Curated annotation (Swiss-Prot):
Substrate binds at R101, E164, F211, E212, Q213, M214, E215, E323, P324, S325, A326, G327. It comes from Thermobifida fusca (strain YX). GO terms for molecular function: ATP binding; glycine-tRNA ligase activity; protein dimerization activity. The gene is glyQS. Belongs to the class-II aminoacyl-tRNA synthetase family. Keywords: Aminoacyl-tRNA synthetase, ATP-binding, Cytoplasm, Ligase, Nucleotide-binding, Protein biosynthesis. One of its GO terms (biological process) is glycyl-tRNA aminoacylation. PANTHER family: DNA POLYMERASE SUBUNIT GAMMA-2, MITOCHONDRIAL, GLYCYL-TRNA SYNTHETASE/DNA POLYMERASE SUBUNIT GAMMA-2. Its EC number is 6.1.1.14. InterPro entries: aa-tRNA-synt_IIb, aa-tRNA-synth_II, aa-tRNA-synth_II/BPL/LPL, Anticodon-bd, Anticodon-bd_dom_sf, Gly-tRNA_synthase/POLG2, Gly_tRNA_ligase_bac, GlyRS-like_core. This is Glycine--tRNA ligase.
Length: 462
């Protein structure tokens, strides 16, 4: 496999060509760091969300789901601290006039040199033009995207597109606790779109202004928060490993106390070795101990009692919150980068050729099986279509009869399809088909009547 820095360009090209991800608004010149998900991309993205929801909600008795609004009352963001504190340091190169986040520039320098720049931005070269010491003094820039609600665009109608899904959970905490009759410890999960006016979006779908989050707010008794925090760090790390991410490409990063968010007692990031230009590691998921900051703040600001009464101990308290927060888009990028493999396989003439394989866990693969008649034939194609239609009732299945069978295998390898089922002329005589496994390319001959059961045994959890 190529180095990940090289693989990124290859992956972007493959993503567009194979219908995973397209540049948004492309026919009008595009919009920076905006991407649309194509037919295969939306399947992969939905599979990522499905596996997360299954692990975090459906397989647990202590977490329930929620779907809150994208636009919340402005007071929510004032109370949470976002209006005042959701800001980033903006600096501009006076040579090329490109703008950057000052903290990202210094962090990249520190990652490369092992120490912060002695003279701050004055020691740094512009990533775009190379000019040294040409940066302006940083000024704070709000990451909130504004909109207006109602017929008049004035201060009275000012609202914000949510920068995170978490606040929608906090303001519904009491509703969920009472209606679902949950007892501490319990959690509320949500998947949804968020928006941030990023200064320097980029690295494909890693950092965008519109993105999707998968978050849980897990409410615990004060004093048990540190134990629960470690539990969620371990649990979330294992989720990625169980779905096929090479553990050597994962690490935990402890936020220094001086860099913690205003609400955090402790934050640990799960990082992946993306090998971006200037930065080997990038945040995949953050797990934060938010203490009682959010519920206390909203309780005080709204006048609503958000405390919890424990009947067993006859005590009342504001719960602490542990928050595992992941981005759907960068999680998808991680699975794609880690699965992308190049090896060699013989072509129809026996000559070895490069083969691109997306070694995705079958639970994530956009297409679970492809049904391929050996050739486009009046006898083979209808039989193959019938089998594909039958399998499609259980999984996402492709039918393809265009081109040489070897090229069709390669197309399916490239998008990560775990199994290809080939209908050939012998099938007309013995009612058997050939099933080819993606990674090993091993082939097995089975009865056409056994294909569904054969796949079901190998696609468990899909």
């Amino acid at each position: 496999m190529a180095a990940k820095s090289e693989a990124m360009d290859t992956l972007v090209s493959l993503a567009k060509r194979r219908g995973l991800v397209y540049p948004s608004s492309e026919i009008y010149g595009g919009l920076r760091a905006s991407w649309d998900y194509g037919p295969l991309g939306v399947e992969l993205k939905n599979n990522v969300k499905r596996q997360w929801w299954r692990a975090m909600v459906q397989e647990r008795e202590d977490i329930v789901g929620l779907d809150s609004c994208v636009i919340l009352a402005r007071e929510v963001w004032e109370a949470s601290g976002h209006v005042d504190a959701f800001v980033d340091p903006l600096t501009e190169c006076q040579s090329c006039h490109k703008r950057f986040r000052a903290d990202h520039l210094t962090e990249a320098y520190e990652a490369k040199h092992g120490k912060p720049p002695a003279n701050g931005l004055a020691d740094l070269n512009c990533p775009h033009c190379g000019a040294k010491g040409a940066f302006t003094e940083p000024r704070m820039f709000s990451g909130l995207l504004r909109t207006y609600v109602g017929p008049v665009q004035d201060e009275s109608g000012l609202a914000f597109l949510r920068p995170e899904t978490a606040q929608g959970i906090f303001i519904n905490y009491k509703n969920v606790e009472q209606s679902s009759r949950r007892k501490i410890p319990f959690g509320i999960a949500q998947i949804g779109k968020s928006f941030r006016n990023e200064i320097t979006p980029g690295n494909f779908i890693f950092r965008t202004r519109e993105f999707e989050q998968m978050e849980v707010e897990f409410f615990v008794r004060p004093g048990t928060d540190e134990e629960w925090h470690q539990y969620w760090i371990d649990t979330r790390l294992q989720w990625y490993i169980d779905l096929g991410i090479n553990k050597d490409n994962l690490r935990l990063y402890e936020h220094p106390k001086e860099k913690l968010s205003h609400y955090s007692k402790r934050t640990v990031d799960i990082e992946y070795r993306f090998n971006f230009a200037g930065s080997e590691w990038g945040e995949l998921e953050g797990i934060a101990n938010r203490t009682d900051y959010d519920l206390s703040t909203h309780s005080k600001r709204s006048g609503t009692d958000l405390s919890y009464f424990d009947q067993e101990t006859n005590t009342r308290f504001i719960p602490y919150v542990i928050e595992p927060s992941a981005g759907v888009d960068r999680t998808m990028l991680t699975f794609l980068l880690d699965a992308y493999t190049e090896d060699e396989a013989p072509n129809a003439k026996g000559k070895m050729e490069k083969r691109v394989v997306m070694r995705l866990d079958p639970r994530l693969a956009p297409v679970k099986a492809a049904v391929l008649p050996l050739s486009r034939n009046a006898d083979l194609s209808p039989k193959a279509r019938d089998l594909a239609a039958k399998l499609r009732k259980r999984w996402n299945v492709e039918f393809d009869d265009a081109g040489a069978i070897g090229r069709r295998y390669r197309r399916q390898d490239e998008i990560g399809t775990p199994f290809c089922v080939t209908i050939d002329f012998d099938t007309l005589e013995d009612n058997a088909v050939t099933v080819r496994e993606r990674d090993s390319m091993a082939q097995e001959r089975i009865s056409i009547d056994q294909v569904e059961q054969y796949l079901a045994e190998r696609l468990a959890g899909c």
